[in-house]
Amino acid sequence: MTTSQQPPERVVVVGGQDWDQVVAAARQNAAEHAGERIVVNMGPQHPSTHGVLRLILEIEGEIIVEARCGIGYLHTGIEKNLEFRNWTQGVTFVTRMDYLSPFFNETAYCLGVEKLLGITDAIPERASVIRVMMMELNRISSHLVALATGGMELGAMTAMFLGFRERELILSVFETITGLRMNNAYIRPGGVAADLPDEALPQVRDLLTLLPKRLRDMEDLLNENYIWKARTQGIGYLDLTGCMALGITGPVLRSTGLPHDLRKAQPYCGYETYDFDVVTDDQCDSYGRYLIRVKEMHQSIRIVEQCVQRLERSVGAPVMITDKKLAWPADLKVGPDGLGNSPEHIAKIMGHSMEGLIHHFKLVTEGIRVPAGQVYVAVESPRGELGVHMVSDGGTRPYRVHYRDPSFTNLQAVAAMCEGGMVADAITAVASIDPVMGGVDR
């Protein structure tokens, strides 16, 4: 039988609880085609698959003939749960989706709610600056994890230690400002949960002094490292045509030379007023994506420095909209005792007037009413375009909230990056995408 007469290869759609069907299909496929092929089930419990990601690899020798992703092992039903909570409570759910970039989840959600309410232009400037500062610090911490886990998977353990060490500095800032290291729920519809504590800006300034030097240490370790370049250059190749066909965004897209960044293309939170550059590369491979993430961290430091200057000039300015029908209390402070000024704040609410207490009770228990309609809002997360399609029926709860998570979309590129390459290079390709399974499965 000639090549043109061979039957087409069978396409297997993989879900959960289907290993028997995959094996049966693989055996039938192997019988129909020449060569010796086996199916390797990499994950979902594997140290190199960025969480509970399952890769179904059909290999011939050391060459990957077919690669497919199996997802859903971290499904939490967050989007469905949002339909049973009021609009403000939804922030505590979405922050847990992509758990390495919680502030981007929160900001996208709040921008959608504010657009439905028609209050986008009423958000206090100080609140927008705080949002930008937190997102850019979060971008740095997320990229540090990407480099740390990617280095660990390729055997560069020093990169892992350095990445997680610097990330701890940023998480300490998050803890000072929000009270939590992760899952912060700090950004709220109308502004932020509370103003910065007095010790926050000095801590951020110290961080900005230390981070550039620490990042240069990591660059000195990896940029010209012979082994690192051998494992990443030319690996996981995906050009601009492939990115456009698959809807790929973020560092993977910018590694093809296209300067697509929503902070410049569709500015939000006042990003058009900040001075920074969109980092690109033209290598289209894993090494190019590594370089982009390193350089993006330096650009984020530039933005945070500008945020600090603006915050120093606006001390005492409001951080929540003034409309009391929409605004949750935003003047609570977290103290060393875990309470801060909450006893005094509660006494003020309860002792001001009975009408004020009733209004506060209804605002918190029932929530705000959002006019009927639907919007799509997107922000530039560390992994690409993070979009929210939000639908309201005019009630106090969302009718539907759907997240377009970049990790989910970018995983489509696994087959294009891996097929025809070596099994060991699949690890590099997935690490260069930097998927977070909490965002993929939701």
From Swiss-Prot:
InterPro entries: NADH_Q_OxRdtase_suD (IPR001135), NADH_UbQ_OxRdtase_49kDa_CS (IPR014029), NDH1_su_D/H (IPR022885), NiFe-Hase_large (IPR029014). HAMAP family: NDH1_NuoD. Its EC number is 7.1.1.-. NCBIfam families: NuoD, PRK06075.1. It is a peripheral membrane protein. It comes from the Bacteria. Keywords: Cell membrane, Membrane, NAD, Quinone, Translocase, Transport. PROSITE patterns: COMPLEX1_49K. PANTHER family: NADH DEHYDROGENASE [UBIQUINONE] IRON-SULFUR PROTEIN 2, MITOCHONDRIAL, NADH-UBIQUINONE OXIDOREDUCTASE 49 KDA SUBUNIT. It is found in: Cell membrane. Belongs to the complex I 49 kDa subunit family. Its main location: membrane. NDH-1 is composed of 14 different subunits. Subunits NuoB, C, D, E, F, and G constitute the peripheral sector of the complex. The keyword RNA-binding does not apply. The keyword Cell membrane applies. One of its GO terms (molecular function) is NADH:ubiquinone reductase (non-electrogenic) activity. This is NADH-quinone oxidoreductase subunit D. It catalyses: a quinone + NADH + 5 H(+)(in) = a quinol + NAD(+) + 4 H(+)(out). It holds the Pfam family Complex1_49kDa. It comes from Mycolicibacterium vanbaalenii (strain DSM 7251 / JCM 13017 / BCRC 16820 / KCTC 9966 / NRRL B-24157 / PYR-1). One of its GO terms (cellular component) is plasma membrane. SUPFAM superfamilies: HydB/Nqo4-like (SSF56762). NDH-1 shuttles electrons from NADH, via FMN and iron-sulfur (Fe-S) centers, to quinones in the respiratory chain. The immediate electron acceptor for the enzyme in this species is believed to be a menaquinone. Couples the redox reaction to proton translocation (for every two electrons transferred, four hydrogen ions are translocated across the cytoplasmic membrane), and thus conserves the redox energy in a proton gradient. Disulfide bonds: none annotated.
